[in-house]
Swiss-Prot record:
Active site (record annotation): 178
A GO molecular function held by the record: NAD binding
GO biological process: organic acid catabolic process
Binding-site residues for NAD(+), renumbered to this chain: 7-35, 102, 246
Protein name stated in the entry: L-threonate dehydrogenase
Reactions catalysed according to its record: L-threonate + NAD(+) = 2-dehydro-L-erythronate + NADH + H(+)
UniProt KW Metal-binding keyword: no
Cited function: Catalyzes oxidation of L-threonate to 2-oxo-tetronate. Can use either NAD(+) or NADP(+) as cosubstrate, with a preference for NAD(+).
Lineage: Bacteria, Pseudomonadati, Pseudomonadota, Gammaproteobacteria, Enterobacterales
Family to which the UniProt record says this protein belongs: Belongs to the HIBADH-related family. L-threonate dehydrogenase subfamily.
Pfam family, one: NAD_binding_11
Keyword vocabulary terms for this entry: Carbohydrate metabolism, NAD, NADP, Oxidoreductase
Gene behind the chain: ltnD
EC number: 1.1.1.411
Amino acid sequence: MKTGSEFHVGIVGLGSMGMGAALSCVRAGLSTWGADLNSNACATLKEAGACGVSDNAATFAEKLDALLVLVVNATQVKQVLFGEKGVAQHLKPGTAVMVSSTIASADAQEIATALAGFGLEMLDAPVSGGAVKAANGEMTVMASGSDIAFERLAPVLEAVAGKVYRIGSEPGLGSTVKIIHQLLAGVHIAAGAEAMALAARAGIPLDVMYDVVTNAAGNSWMFENRMRHVVDGDYTPHSAVDIFVKDLGLVADTAKALHFPLPLASTALNMFTSASNAGYGKEDDSAVIKIFSGITLPGAKS
């Protein structure tokens, strides 16, 4: 198996997670290629040592041993792979495709079947950990797929992941685990926002409330990470409100298919949907706190 600079990997989607993954591949010594519609992101990756960048991965597809797709949703994944300028038709048979977007299990299965038609192996491999862990090559990967897919993607997984969980051999299982994880993530953010909103209404300084919770049993990773943005009055999007409208929608769809009630997740989805409807969809997901009326939130620090 190829290793180091002999191994060519392309990353499609150079947002916070995709850029982190791409930079991790560069640091690991892999010959790294990147594609994104954002020319600034492409320039950043090229300056960091990528072999090449483009707004379309098809331009370098034939060079690749593996492709990592980390875009927003299933529609974008399908467009990248099978659209008018889709990359799948340009990849060498046997190339491994790691789909790391948060998508429905059924979409993962459909994409895997379509890729197989091109002689390509797919690893259903959604990721978590946030931008910092992505940048440090320490993402958590929830993966399902064939032994061949895992083997062919080993250099990429070693470069980008701190932990790799092998969920099973069938595409779709990894996506299901990620969707369940997103249930918890969304509920934690919504609950944190509700708690901080109540503190604001009660006249408790939010920096004090934050300090207490992060040093007590009620803390969670999402509270500590996202409610810091509220305290700082900084809603620059690291993960936007609309992402959780999408992800909690996938949670709801999964539960509906299984005839399973999810009262907390349903409430969280309603909260994020309300925030999006109020015009906060492109802000950081912590902006869900803005749906509460009658409170004063901290402003951005100069």
